[in-house]
């Protein structure tokens, strides 16, 4: 399933991120806020346990998240999305995965992977601001599937149609959440109109 957001706050904040004049601090702030806005849809089907609590007035049955949640940023740009979700889900664990493109074969290769033990039978949420060709994201999903999570969701801010089709083709069982579906990839595989190199803009390394 692919869900493309249509929300005025997301559109406003994403426009600010796209501007070439936006400095790194503001870029990170808007990335965090958009991630939090997207979290409402991403987490709406999580299961709950009933628990008894005591309010200042009386006892009652409340709710507690039942699911094990693992946030998995694709290094390095995905790191900019972690804090927003971690604030909303403080019990979430965090894994990390690094993918690079082999210059000779043009195929994505894993260079780093560290996952928490509770990923098995848990709910994996993969984070990456950009979905361009879909190669790195598809490879990350393939690796994460070996840990046998209960569900896998992929969150990105800006996607090219080519990248979206790649994931839908290779992983039709994955839920994909996109803040904006852009026009295309250019000859250098940058998303058009896009927002530039998200990693450089997050960390100020342009």
UniProtKB/Swiss-Prot annotation:
<dbReference type="InterPro" id="IPR050054">
    <property type="entry name" value="UPRTase/APRTase"/>
</dbReference>
<feature type="binding site">
    <location>
        <position position="101"/>
    </location>
    <ligand>
        <name>5-phospho-alpha-D-ribose 1-diphosphate</name>
    </ligand>
</feature>
<feature type="binding site">
    <location>
        <begin position="128"/>
        <end position="136"/>
    </location>
    <ligand>
        <name>5-phospho-alpha-D-ribose 1-diphosphate</name>
    </ligand>
</feature>
<dbReference type="InterPro" id="IPR000836">
    <property type="entry name" value="PRibTrfase_dom"/>
</dbReference>
<comment type="pathway">
    <text>Pyrimidine metabolism; UMP biosynthesis via salvage pathway; UMP from uracil: step 1/1.</text>
</comment>
<feature type="binding site">
    <location>
        <begin position="196"/>
        <end position="198"/>
    </location>
    <ligand>
        <name>uracil</name>
    </ligand>
</feature>
<feature type="binding site">
    <location>
        <position position="191"/>
    </location>
    <ligand>
        <name>uracil</name>
    </ligand>
</feature>
<dbReference type="GO" id="GO:0005525">
    <property type="term" value="F:GTP binding"/>
</dbReference>
<dbReference type="Pfam" id="PF14681">
    <property type="entry name" value="UPRTase"/>
</dbReference>
<protein>
    <recommendedName>
        <fullName>Uracil phosphoribosyltransferase</fullName>
        <ecNumber>2.4.2.9</ecNumber>
    </recommendedName>
</protein>
<dbReference type="InterPro" id="IPR029057">
    <property type="entry name" value="PRTase-like"/>
</dbReference>
<dbReference type="GO" id="GO:0000287">
    <property type="term" value="F:magnesium ion binding"/>
</dbReference>
<keyword id="KW-0342">GTP-binding</keyword>
<feature type="binding site">
    <location>
        <position position="197"/>
    </location>
    <ligand>
        <name>5-phospho-alpha-D-ribose 1-diphosphate</name>
    </ligand>
</feature>
<dbReference type="GO" id="GO:0004845">
    <property type="term" value="F:uracil phosphoribosyltransferase activity"/>
</dbReference>
<keyword id="KW-0328">Glycosyltransferase</keyword>
<keyword id="KW-0460">Magnesium</keyword>
<feature type="binding site">
    <location>
        <position position="76"/>
    </location>
    <ligand>
        <name>5-phospho-alpha-D-ribose 1-diphosphate</name>
    </ligand>
</feature>
<dbReference type="GO" id="GO:0044206">
    <property type="term" value="P:UMP salvage"/>
</dbReference>
<dbReference type="InterPro" id="IPR005765">
    <property type="entry name" value="Ura_phspho_trans"/>
</dbReference>
<keyword id="KW-0808">Transferase</keyword>
<comment type="similarity">
    <text>Belongs to the UPRTase family.</text>
</comment>
<keyword id="KW-0021">Allosteric enzyme</keyword>
<dbReference type="InterPro" id="IPR034332">
    <property type="entry name" value="Upp_B"/>
</dbReference>
<keyword id="KW-0547">Nucleotide-binding</keyword>
<dbReference type="GO" id="GO:0006223">
    <property type="term" value="P:uracil salvage"/>
</dbReference>
<comment type="function">
    <text>Catalyzes the conversion of uracil and 5-phospho-alpha-D-ribose 1-diphosphate (PRPP) to UMP and diphosphate.</text>
</comment>
């Amino acid at each position: 399933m692919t869900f493309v957001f249509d929300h005025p706050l997301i559109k406003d904040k994403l426009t600010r991120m796209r501007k070439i004049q936006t400095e790194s601090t503001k870029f990170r702030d808007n990335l965090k806020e958009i991630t939090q806005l997207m979290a409402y849809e991403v987490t709406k089907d999580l299961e709950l346990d009933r628990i008894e609590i005591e309010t200042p007035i009386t006892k009652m049955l409340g709710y507690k998240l039942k699911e094990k949640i693992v946030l998995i940023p694709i290094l390095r740009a995905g790191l900019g999305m972690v804090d927003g979700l971690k604030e909303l889900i403080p019990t979430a664990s965090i894994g990390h995965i690094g993918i690079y493109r082999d210059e000779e074969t043009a195929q994505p290769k894993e260079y780093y992977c560290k996952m928490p033990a509770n990923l098995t039978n848990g709910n994996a949420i993969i984070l990456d601001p950009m979905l361009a060709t879909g190669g790195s994201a598809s490879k990350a999903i393939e690796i994460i599937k070996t840990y046998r999570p209960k569900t896998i969701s992929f969150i990105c801010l800006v996607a090219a149609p080519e990248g979206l089709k790649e994931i839908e083709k290779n992983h039709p069982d994955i839920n994909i959440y996109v803040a904006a579906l852009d026009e295309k990839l250019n000859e250098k595989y940058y998303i058009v109109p896009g927002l530039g190199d998200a990693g450089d803009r997050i960390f100020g390394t342009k």
